[in-house]
Amino acid sequence: MRTANNGLLDLFDLEKKGVGLNHDYQHWKFNRHIFLQAVMPLSSTNKPSQYVNLLFEEMSNYWIDLKHKNDDSVVIDISTWMRRFTSDFISLLTTGQQMSTINYYYRMIKNEEVTKEMIDSENFIESINTFVSDNQILFVPKILRNFPIIKSRVDHMLGNCNYFYGKLVEIVRKRREEMKNSDDINKFISKKNDLLTSLIIANTQYDPQPQKNADPSLLRPMNDDEIRGVMFDAFVAGTDTTVNTFCFALYYLSHNPDVKKKLVEEIESVFQDDFNRPITFDDLEKLKYCEAVIKETSRVRPTVSMVSRYSSKSDKVAGYEWPSNVLFILYVRGINTNPLYWKDPEKFDPERFYDPQEIENQHKNSFSMFGGGPRMCLGRKIAMIEMKTLLALIYRKFDVELVDMQAPLQVETSTITICKELNVKLTPRKRVV
């Protein structure tokens, strides 16, 4: 397990839900099995890249519309835009439907009218942000739950989670109703092909990949609350971690012009001077340096600085015998910058993950961008697809500069490290004639 269950996970109805914070082994095993079964097919298709292309085109058109009248550039807080981008992306991937948070933010900047649907989408994303920014309250000992300052935070988070859960269950039930009322349910399922539909039909007569040899306890369908738990994980884990890693990458690229130059050269070698054609799954396979930049960003500035594991039985770790019920905390950033494993550990150098010799010499446990073991991030392949596609799209279409090269990264750390603000200047690139 990740933690000892002496906090408030049960109060927030997370103790047996989803996979990220689930503390019940049997429920976690079941949820993980179904989640993995649903998400893996998406990882090997063009669908994630198609959604990133679609949303980036919308967002970049807004940026171009916002550019200065006497200048060809626009200054934006990229972190604010990217939080809305990733929320719309996860919504498309999980439900097949876009929220409208990118459009909402653009209209607010332009002081244009917004619809109720847009406001609802914005409220939804804000509920995710609230959970991410204050989720350490989940681990407060139960005995402190009613202390004055803590009580107000707990009550606020409870209200936020109840709203979030309610919206997710509403989405699940609406999809079940759509399936029930469809003239041809098989055609409906084939057309949707999203995470939510896959979760609903898992272990039913409509499951295209029925499991026959699995543990019998894993062969039942999910109920609405169980699906809600998995959807919760998808939205929370699929938004902020990606946003922050992407923003940190832009920061470090701006401070390392040689690295940025090599990245742009790789992008140009794949796409030539075509700034507009959609990026495909096959293109991503060629963007090796782009992936190295993302990995090096995660090494230098991991979004999750500490990882915990709670032992359910006695074991031998690091040459010592440990009893059961011990909480182990791994300081990820410390490992990532330990000179025992990394040469010049403070230096931003993507060659560590690009040069074959560097990769071969790397200690196998010195870098774990997506965690390790059975609790490893289930959406890691999709996250990498999203970030690689985004990096290629933005540096293919724009020259990206920090507004203030002297300003330090504006971060806030709780259970994850959040990029609070990153102001960049974007200038559309021009084709070389």
Where are these regions (language model features)?
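Cytochrome P450 substrate-recognition site 1
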Residues: 1-51, 78, 82-89, 107-145, ...
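Hydrophobic mid-domain F-helix/FG-region of cytochrome P450s
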Residues: 56-60, 75-114, 165-173, 195-199, ...
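Conserved cytochrome P450 catalytic core segment spanning the I/J/K helices
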Residues: 40-44, 160-245, 287, 309, ...
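Conserved cytochrome P450 K-helix E-x-x-R motif and the immediately C-terminal K′/meander segment
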Residues: 166, 170, 277-318, 339
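Cytochrome P450 heme-thiolate "Cys pocket" and heme-binding signature region
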Residues: 17, 232, 237, 278, ...
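Conserved cytochrome P450 K-helix/beta-meander segment immediately N-terminal to the heme-binding cysteine loop
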Residues: 330-358
